[in-house]
A protein has these predicted regions:
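Short, flexible turn/loop "capping" segments at secondary-structure junctions
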Residues: 2, 113-116
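Residue-level detector of short, conserved catalytic/binding motifs and their immediate flanks
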Residues: 6, 119-120
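N-terminal anchoring/stem segment of glycosyltransferases
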Residues: 1-70, 126-128
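Flexible, glycine-/basic-rich loop-and-beta segments that form/coincide
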Residues: 131
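GT-A fold catalytic core of metal-dependent nucleotide-sugar glycosyltransferases
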Residues: 54-114, 121-127
Length: 131
């Protein structure tokens, strides 16, 4: 049974590394009954990894626009999902994510980190504020 209230999205480049991870993630999401949009993208000439990752926000916005009643979760294509915990899937938050390295607030060491959020998994709710 597919959950109708959420969708997982990601994109990947067509090289062997990322396309094989896309295939594995797609299979996991299908097994879990989680709707998904996994998009193959082409890198522009001269585009590097940082340029490619900057396309993430526009892509997520397009998934939100196409799915206004669904929570939208971004998962890096080379991540694995064994299950989606209820406290995440059923969250009513506008924005949900994990802090860097998935640590507790006492372990993060803000002075040692350049970013608070772990960019590999985060989600948006369906409220106007979230979108």
């Amino acid at each position: 049974v597919t959950r109708q209230d959420l969708i997982v999205c990601s994109f990947y480049t067509p090289d062997n590394y990322y396309s094989s991870h896309a295939k594995a993630l797609r299979a996991e999401l299908d097994r879990l009954g989680i709707d998904h949009e996994l998009l193959e993208i082409k890198k522009a000439p001269g585009e590097d990894w940082a340029d490619t990752t900057r396309r993430k926000i526009g892509f997520i916005k397009s998934v939100c626009d196409k799915n206004p009643t669904k929570k939208v979760f971004w998962v890096d294509i080379d991540c694995r999902i064994n299950y989606l915990p209820d406290y995440i899937a059923n969250s009513t938050a506008d924005l949900i994510g994990f802090q860097r390295s998935f640590g507790s607030p006492l372990q993060i060491g803000y002075g040692n980190r350049t970013r608070f959020w772990e960019p590999s998994f985060w989600g948006l709710g369906t409220s106007p504020q979230a979108r």
